[in-house]
């Protein structure tokens, strides 16, 4: 057995509801999660079409600049029209489990597993010799070329297999955590009597991740003939409900991988027939499940499975795996854990930065938005030209950005395949795109955050991010698409000066310091062909910039952008067209959907129709003084060094604290 240390004291966690639903949701009365599923390919349907009003909860700050929704997806906040409120700033959520000790309610004792006792030096062979792992699983690992276990697998396998407690594990992405929770499921199936009922349920936040876990299960089964008798089925929205019933009846699976909505659908329809013998429920990417808004659905799944179980309502073990463990994850764990004792396994050193140490990180800093979007296209084109074997992923904030910028990259990188991937695609199209990208020796995938978590493409060399991610946490998950399974990888984020606040957030919250910093000087580069590409389709450029403005509005609560951010995007239209007199056009009624109603910003747009007088920036400014700065003679904003030191003219150096 292993040694345990540090029994945590229980404490209650108070939650506050999320306050910024999409304007579309309010207009049509659709719940936040149902609308999210409808737009972005996540599974929130129930059998009778009921709506799961699983509002996001926790201490994440809602957007204070409220405007109607955009095409943002996968963890991005929407907003509604209304009065601006003073931004409260982004202090960031603390990772309570890592810094204060993971704790649950008064009925559950949390036991922290010591690293050295969890089997840090374990190998597949030693686990077989100790009777922890079966020969079948050992042969499966050998046939797949896995002679060693990853650190995450070494720390988690023995605690899971040698106890009957619930388990919460914190692990970085790309560290082999999927295999770490699948091997115990197969081990228990090998040890138990034959059964035609479901013995384990694995819940994933997205269809793509569910499909990936299902494929991993099939690879394990195909690697050893004795494992093939344990069938598995994947159930997710977007697929035929009738076909799901047929698969359950025909295959009689022992393992079910599902997204929450479709799982509830099947439990309501045929739970007593197939789900009465469940021993395990696994929540993969638990933080993502909560960010999307699945908390109530997960609690309902837990209640149904407990009620159906023949061995009692407290029989099912819970394995919860997450890259981050904030108060929201602790609250979820507290509501779905069945056993009196929960093991907490933290595979991340609290003094270690949250990103994978195998990933070389870099930031390219540009003066403004126009230079930043130009720098990203220019730099990635040059890298693809210099490295014909480049295999990379480029993350953009919105669907429109993926389609517009991605097609520009396709026109610039003639010899490199460029694929587009986002939540607006059908599930079949998404599956075929990922299958094609995995099979490529070289190529570039341009995508939204739908691919940021859990998606495994083992040979990605470089991850690029254009602008700030939808949340600072997503920076960690995005770059986790490279440097997987012990390989080396590279990451580059392109930022305008007004976006540098994210570097400070990453440093304070995640202990991530990007020391490799480069300033992009547009004047020193030959960019005529790149700038010409932006001017070929003015309408699409116009739409692209408006969607970026809307994204900024929705992310205001995360980053507390200065007014200069909106001014920079507004001026980008004329800059990219090569004509400073060109302006973006906005309806007065929709003005505050995209920008704060401030003279310094509004003067840069062609505004059609009257501006809604009730929608204001929050003050009347007759002296042209801004709440956090003032306008200089040229109309640019000057900022207080105390509050917005990152908004100054930036010269990159480590001494700046980034």
From Swiss-Prot:
Q: The organism sits in which domain of life? A: Eukaryota
* Sequence ranges assigned to domain Helicase ATP-binding in this UniProt record: 158-343
List the GO molecular function terms: ATP binding; ATP hydrolysis activity; G-quadruplex DNA binding; G-quadruplex RNA binding; RNA helicase activity; RNA strand annealing activity
Instruction: Give binding positions for ATP.
Output: 171-178
Its UniProt entry gives the catalysed reaction(s) as:
ATP + H2O = ADP + phosphate + H(+)
Provide the Helicase C-terminal domain boundaries. 372-528
What keywords is this UniProt entry annotated with?
ATP-binding, Helicase, Hydrolase, Mitochondrion, mRNA processing, mRNA splicing, Nucleotide-binding, RNA-binding, Transit peptide, Translation regulation
The enzyme's main class, written as a single word, is hydrolase
Its localization reads: Mitochondrion matrix
Xref: Pfam families: DEAD (PF00270), Helicase_C (PF00271)
Q: What is known of its domains?
A: The Q motif is unique to and characteristic of the DEAD box family of RNA helicases and controls ATP binding and hydrolysis.
Similarity comment: Belongs to the DEAD box helicase family. DDX18/HAS1 subfamily.
What is the protein's known function? ATP-dependent RNA helicase required for mitochondrial splicing of group I and II introns. Also required for efficient mitochondrial translation.
Write the protein's name.
ATP-dependent RNA helicase MSS116, mitochondrial
**Source organism:** Eremothecium gossypii (strain ATCC 10895 / CBS 109.51 / FGSC 9923 / NRRL Y-1056)
């Amino acid at each position: 057995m292993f040694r345990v240390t540090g029994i945590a004291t229980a404490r209650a966690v108070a939650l506050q509801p999320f306050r910024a639903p999409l304007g579309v949701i309010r207009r049509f009365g659709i719940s936040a999660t149902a609308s999210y599923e409808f737009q972005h390919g996540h599974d929130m349907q129930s059998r009778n079409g009921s709506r799961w009003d699983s509002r996001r909860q926790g201490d994440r700050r809602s957007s204070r600049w409220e405007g109607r929704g955009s095409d943002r997806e996968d963890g991005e906040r929407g907003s509604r029209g209304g009065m601006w409120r003073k931004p409260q700033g982004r202090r960031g959520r603390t990772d309570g489990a890592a810094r204060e000790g993971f704790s649950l309610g008064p009925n559950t004792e949390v036991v922290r597993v010591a690293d050295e006792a969890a089997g840090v030096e374990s190998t597949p062979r030693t686990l077989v010799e100790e009777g922890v792992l079966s020969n079948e699983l050992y042969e499966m690992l050998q046939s797949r070329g896995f002679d060693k276990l990853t650190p995450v697998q070494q720390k988690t396998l023995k605690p899971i297999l040698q106890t009957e407690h619930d388990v919460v594990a914190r692990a970085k992405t790309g560290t082999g955590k999927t295999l770490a929770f699948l091997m115990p499921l197969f081990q228990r199936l090998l040890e138990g009597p034959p059964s035609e009922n479901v013995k384990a349920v694995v819940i994933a936040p997205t269809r793509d991740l569910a499909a990936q876990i299902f494929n991993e299960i099939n690879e394990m089964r195909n690697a050893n003939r004795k494992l093939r008798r344990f069938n598995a089925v994947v159930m997710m929205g977007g697929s035929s409900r009738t076909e799901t019933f047929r698969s359950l009846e025909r295959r009689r699976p022992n393992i079910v991988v599902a997204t929450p909505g479709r799982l509830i659908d099947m439990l309501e329809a045929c739970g007593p027939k197939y789900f009465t013998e469940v021993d395990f429920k696994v929540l993969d990417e638990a933080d993502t499940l909560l960010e999307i808004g699945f908390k109530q659905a997960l609690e309902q799944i837990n209640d149904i499975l407990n009620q159906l179980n023949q061995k009692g309502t407290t029989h099912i073990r819970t394995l919860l795996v997450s890259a981050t463990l904030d108060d929201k994850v602790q609250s979820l764990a507290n509501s779905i854990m069945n056993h009196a004792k929960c093991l907490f396994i933290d595979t991340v050193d609290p003094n270690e930065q949250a990103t994978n140490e195998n990933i070389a990180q870099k930031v390219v800093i540009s003066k403004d938005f126009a230079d930043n979007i130009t720098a990203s296209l220019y730099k990635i084109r040059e890298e693809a030209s210099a490295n014909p074997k480049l295999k990379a992923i480029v993350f953009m904030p919105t669907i429109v950005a993926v389609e517009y910028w991605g097609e520009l990259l396709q026109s610039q990188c003639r010899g490199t395949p460029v694929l587009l991937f986002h939540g607006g695609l059908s599930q079949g199209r998404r599956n075929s795109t990922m299958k094609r990208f995995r099979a490529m020796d070289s190529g570039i995938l341009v995508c939204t955050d739908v691919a940021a978590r859990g998606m495994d493409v083992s040979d990605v060399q470089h991850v690029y991010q254009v602008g700030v991610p939808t949340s600072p946490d997503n920076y960690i998950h995005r770059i986790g698409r490279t440097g997987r399974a012990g390989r080396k990888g590279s990451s580059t984020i392109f930022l305008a000066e007004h976006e540098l606040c994210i570097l400070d957030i990453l440093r304070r919250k995640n202990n991530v310091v990007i020391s490799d910093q480069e300033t992009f000087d547009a004047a020193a580069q030959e960019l005529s062909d790149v700038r010409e590409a932006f001017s070929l389709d003015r309408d699409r450029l116009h739409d692209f910039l408006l969607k970026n403005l809307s994204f900024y509005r929705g992310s205001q609560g995360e980053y507390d952008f200065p007014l200069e951010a909106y001014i920079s995007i507004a001026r980008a239209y004329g800059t990219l067209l090569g004509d400073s007199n060109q302006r973006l056009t906005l309806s007065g009624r929709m003005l505050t959907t995209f920008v704060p109603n401030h003279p310094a910003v509004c003067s840069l747009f062609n505004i059609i129709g009257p501006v809604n007088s009730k929608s204001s920036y929050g003050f009347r400014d007759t002296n042209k003084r801004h709440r956090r700065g003032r306008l200089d003679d040229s109309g640019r904003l000057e900022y207080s060094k105390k509050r917005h030191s990152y908004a100054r003219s930036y010269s990159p150096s480590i001494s700046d604290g980034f």
